[in-house]
Amino acid sequence: MNKTPTTLIIMDGFGLRTETEGNAVAAANTPRLDQFFQEYAHTDLSASGLDVGLPAGQMGNSEVGHTNIGAGRVVFQDLPRISKSIDDGDFFQNPAYVHAMDACKEKRSALHLMGLLSDGGVHSHIDHLFALMQMAKDRGLERVYIHAFLDGRDVSPTSGVDYVTRTVEKCRELGVGKIATLMGRYYAMDRDKRWDRVEAAYDAMVYGESAHVNPLPVAAVKDAYAAGVTDEFIEPVICDGDGTISDNDSVIFFNYRPDRAREITRTLVDPKFDGFTRQYFPVTFVCTTEYDATMPNVEVAYPRQAVRNGLGEYLSNLGLTQLRIAETEKYAHVTFFFNGGVETQFPGEDRVLVPSPKVATYDLQPEMSAYEVCDKCVERIESGAYDVIILNFANCDMVGHTGVFDAAVKAVETVDECVGKVVDATMKMGGIAMITADHGNAETMTQEDGSPMTAHTTDLVPFILCGAGSELRQGRLADIAPTILDVMGLAAPEEMDGQTLIVK
């Protein structure tokens, strides 16, 4: 007997904004979404700041969004958790950090601090680096090297020079630390097994090898700008040849978001890594959060706080079936993050991964793999095998990050077409479809001065309920899971403090 599906469609990076200037969502031709807004109950959801467990005014992101959606409650995020520990002093006694620094003194080795130099708050925060530098000084360390990854994606594309300047000044102020290497996140923070990029980052940090050498970090960034290269894409630069990562050194990776921290970490800690040829050697390595439960030879400074009875676990315990489907760029979000940071696949949970296209930047192929994701999802819906389907279309976010307006418009139009097909298939099976987003992006493609805007936004996101409910209230992402359970006639578990969006 065929199941009646409840399908949740997450349009990654699709926010709501009334102004049309630089708004790829408004500029796009979206006949299907226009139809759904016209025909079905809809509302707006908060996807940023305190409503998703971030500091007030902090833009949302995909990890946080999917975590809150899957949990059915507001989940306190790593950024405020770590920042609070700095404020109350616990940070400076963190056992993992203490061990890494003490190991340097015992072995007379160097401490390396690596991570994204940014205050965008998505993957890292520069204040956490500065706290580690202060801690290193307090513990009497002298050889402290910084491997700076430049952002340009969650913040302005040419803001890197400011962060590098601040870091150089902080080194001077404390009398501790030197920038050994700097590079765009394009190289150091890949998540799609583009090992040529990761190898370039590794070679710079471990071997001190790169075509670019400049002992002046600020000048190195300015040189890149002069050549037309923005922060994200700056090729690795060697700033201090003595600052290579060597045997028995300690490394602290201060990024707290796992997905883009895994690959470069594995090159340094996993003897079985085979993405490219390199020599393994022992280091004391600290991941600020748990990047991967299978990661060997690491300590974790801030272990993940368990999310009990999230939507996936709850459905599984009830004996219901569920499908998670996305392309590579967002696969971790509909699985790992949606499940509250649990690597385990729950009984009754199937997963479909569609490879993302191998292009340098997604403005070159704004359709990405959406059509294949759509076709595979429709096929699974028509199979009648699933009670719940969780689907992510990556386009609006990934193409939005490029800052290329016309490509973002095409991305929105692609998503519109695919969402229409998935909703049609769901309704044909007698099911209910929900359309939403995890955060904003494509609705704001330009900054006030007209330059490209590549970061997320704090805008509200849509929620459309196709096939049930005549009136919806405003809410937040944590209310989606209770709404799914509501339309399925199921009580929400007591751990979920989100509330159904349906007005009774």
Predicted regions: what is each one?
Residues 1-504:
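Feature captures the catalytic ectodomains and active-site-proximal regions of enzymes
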